[in-house]
Amino acid sequence: MKNIYKQSVLLVALVAILSSIVAPSANAAEKGYRYWGYFQAAPGAKTWTMAMTGPTVPIADGSVEGWAFTFSSDSIPDAATPHLAPNFSRICGLVKTVPAGKKRIGLVVDFGSAFLRPKGEKMPRNFTKCVVVDKNAVGVDVLSQVVKVRTEGSGFICAFSNYPAKECGAEITTPVALIHKK
């Protein structure tokens, strides 16, 4: 009986040791994606809403469109919104009237946190701009008036003004700076 007890204790200890060696921490090698996240704020809204569709849907006059170079993964599903809150009056306050058939849209472009920057690349400065577009314009029309947009064959947005220079929705290891924020 004593032998069986000792064997059981040894077996449990061995399993615990092997588990800690063989099974690394779930976050240690977790992968996710670095990409341009698309956010919207309806007229009068003060917070961002992640767009559930691409930038090919109509947007109302007085809206703010937001783009952020961001990251998400299985354990970090919520992409970071632009650091600047949507504020149409601050962005478009100086553009009081527009010609018939046009609309004003606030645009916020956030090039992300330094820890997301692809190696060897220089991050452009974040910016806001009031964009006057045709009344039927969609999000990509607003964006294309301000920055050079590079897309993948499927239409997935890869880069603004050549940032990032080569990648498109790259799979990367979860940045250490994000692991502690969960």
Annotated model-derived regions:
Residues 2, 18-182:
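Ubiquitin-like/PB1-type beta-grasp interaction modules and other compact soluble beta-rich domains
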